[in-house]
Amino acid sequence: MTKPRVAVIGTGGTISSVGRHSLDLVRYIENNKVYEVDELLNAFPEPLEQADLVPVRLKAIPSTAIGPVDWLAINAKVNEVIDDDPSIDGIVITHGTATLEETAYFLNLVAQV
């Protein structure tokens, strides 16, 4: 059975933060380091057992800084991925928790997927 091909668009946020050690769940932001999406996927290889993941870099910023301009950029990147690679079966967007629901709501309204 072939694995689904899934694009993973990275936008930064908590999920991409690099702590001082693996259990740094509180003060990770003080380290001021973030994974780009391909580095994040390499750090957690287990999902690769379930799908062929295609990393797509967009930006790596705190989710508190994401707003309308970024939402448009995310939507444009989703459309670009779909248009450029018809073999993509799905898209995952990594995102921090602070504005996740706003981004999801915006994409629900405007994405033409």
Region annotations inferred by a language model:
Residues 2-83:
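N-terminal glycine-rich anion-binding loop in soluble enzyme alpha/beta folds
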Residues 93-113:
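Short Gly/Thr/Asp-enriched flexible loops that form oxyanion-binding sites at enzyme active sites
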Residues 89-90:
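Structural motif
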